[in-house]
């Protein structure tokens, strides 16, 4: 446990809550006093990490609630400026994240996919929790704070995260700083720009998302899109510039309706398991059969593979089932609800 603060870690706790409630007929027994205390802590962290580096009135550096600094020979394993991280501007509505989903330090601290993830989960918490519980003075206060964050983050993403790219047009940047700085890239780990429809921020047909998707899945649009003779996909700085992550191809499948793109991506991930039949963390794009890989059994990616197959069972059954089963309409959520 490294104490690396990531906004998506907080959002994931809310994801777990929302999915529990939505799949168990909104059984509110989980919303205990302990849960409320945890939720209040999340709001406190969001408040603190929404502060700019400099006081807008005096221009002086403000006190910092979170610092991360350590001796390392890897630049992405610590934060600059004495552990503070690079400056962010005020009045953006966005929330800082010191690290990305796989522990690499952010360059510009407003991590866009993480803010999108948090925004969507806060909206669902209002619908799944606050709209259903008995209101008290305390829950009313928490609801008001939640709604303010929803408004602020939504506006912040609209005003700062969408940037006009000289080649790709209006796209979502991976990170921004509120000063006009924007980082054009994507990382395989979720949440990512590629996964924005799954965060609930937008639909996969959204024109800005479509521009963004083309950018991050292009060698000349995303510095971490890696392509070799045997494998291709989005990688990231965590492993290096030779390895793409199967996870990115699974997300590619879930964000398209194109049968050819889906089948090509499925073939890539199935042909690069090094004979183990399991998803790896990353695969060297120049490795035949995926024999040069990291982590032989990466639980996160195996879970994403299972999720992808369930997605195809509902939306594209003809691509994965024999003909006699391909015309069956599958309702996976209903099936799981029956099992639970």
Can you describe what each PLM-predicted range is?
Residues 23-26, 128-131, 135, 315:
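Alpha-solenoid helical repeat scaffolds
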Residues 1, 102-109, 289-292:
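Short coil/turn segments at secondary-structure junctions
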Residues 33, 40-119, 131-132, 140-245:
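Extended ligand-binding clefts on enzyme/binding-domain cores
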């Amino acid at each position: 446990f490294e104490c690396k603060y990531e906004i998506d870690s907080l959002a994931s706790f809310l994801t777990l809550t929302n999915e529990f409630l939505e799949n168990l007929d909104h059984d509110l027994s989980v919303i205990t006093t302990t849960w409320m205390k945890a939720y209040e802590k999340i709001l406190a962290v969001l408040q603190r990490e929404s502060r700019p580096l400099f006081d807008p009135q005096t221009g002086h550096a403000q006190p910092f609630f979170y610092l991360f600094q350590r001796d390392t020979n890897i630049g992405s394993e610590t934060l600059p400026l004495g552990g503070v991280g690079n400056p962010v501007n005020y009045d953006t509505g966005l929330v800082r994240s010191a690290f990305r989903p796989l522990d690499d330090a952010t360059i510009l601290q407003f991590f866009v996919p993480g803010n999108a993830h948090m925004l969507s989960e806060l909206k669902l918490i209002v619908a799944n929790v606050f709209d259903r519980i008995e209101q008290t003075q305390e829950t009313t206060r928490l609801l008001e704070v939640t709604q303010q964050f929803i408004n602020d983050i939504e506006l912040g993403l609209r005003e700062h995260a969408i940037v006009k790219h000289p080649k790709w047009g209006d796209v979502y940047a991976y990170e921004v700083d509120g000063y006009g700085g924007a980082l054009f890239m994507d990382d395989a780990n979720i949440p990512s720009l590629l996964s924005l429809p799954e965060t609930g921020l937008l639909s996969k047909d959204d024109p800005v998302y479509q521009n963004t998707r083309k950018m991050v899945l292009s060698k000349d649009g995303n510095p971490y899109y890696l392509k070799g003779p045997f494998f291709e996909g989005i990688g990231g700085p965590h492993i290096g510039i030779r390895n793409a992550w199967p996870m990115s191809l699974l997300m590619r499948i879930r964000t398209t309706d194109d049968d050819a793109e889906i089948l090509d991506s499925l073939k890539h991930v199935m042909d690069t398991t090094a004979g183990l039949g399991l998803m790896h963390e990353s695969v060297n794009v120049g490795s035949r059969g995926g024999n040069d890989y990291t982590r032989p059994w990466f639980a996160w990616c195996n879970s994403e593979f299972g999720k992808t197959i369930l997605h195809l069972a509902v939306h594209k059954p003809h691509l994965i089932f024999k003909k006699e089963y391909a015309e069956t309409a599958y309702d996976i959520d209903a099936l799981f609800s029956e099992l639970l």
